[in-house]
Amino acid sequence: LAGCEYTTVYKGKEEQLPYGYEEKIKEDDTYAMYRSGSSLPFSYVYDSYMDKEDYDKLSVTEKQQAALQVCVVDKDEELTGLNEASESVKYTDQEIPYEVESSKDVKVLEDGFKVSRNGGSITLKFDGLDESETYLIVEDMDYQSEKQELEEAAAVNLNIEYENNKKTIHYMTDKNNFYCGVKDFLVNMGYHRGGGKEMTISFQKAGTYTFSDFRIVCQPVKDFSEMTAACKQNGLSDVTFEGNSMTGMITNEESQMLCITIPYCEGWTAYVDGEETNL
């Protein structure tokens, strides 16, 4: 959605590449750069929309799918000629059931895990989907240290390993000087042609870890190319930048919404054929 055509990874860590980044462009002793043939361009269009109130009710994985199919707008926007498509958005993500295999250092609780030793771990056993990205999603995370010292309770890591891909959740408690209230995490463990069978999670520090939700979700990618192709059907041409403005040309036979991948901030004004329009 942000129009990122290129990405880099450490050499030898290609399993961390997001789906679609397959063409190696260049490399040095440390990094390799890859290009995606499915990335969206600098600008693209939508011909349907979803009300933001409906969008906010979706799960995190549903939101990323919706954003590829419809434009999200506030309810009070006047959108003549566009389709309201909240009911027709296609969702293919699947929550995957799992069994917990814990070590002697981890006790499974109803809402989390009690870890008695630094580095204690659990293994989640499940049947992952083929041709999918696999996510670990945790919500409303909380950590209570076994010790009372401030430094022991300020931050903690969860180290996750799945199919040779390693990721880390760095969680800061409200005792951390850099605490910012983040308690929900989605960890993308990568795209795999064949579904994996287990995910190992190790807890850096002893203590009690609780969550309101702790789940595995697989996101099939078979419809991804079709969705991006629909967005690419139209967009700006002859784009020029000058000072704090940009211009471009677009021709469309029916009403569409144009998305330009410039991060939004207050102060922008848009004109279509010389007439000011809504942003």
Predicted segment positions?
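Active-site-proximal, structured, solvent-exposed surfaces of multi-pass membrane proteins
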Residues: 96-279
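A cross-kingdom signal targeting lumenal/periplasmic-facing segments of multi-pass membrane
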Residues: 1-104, 112, 116, 123-127, ...
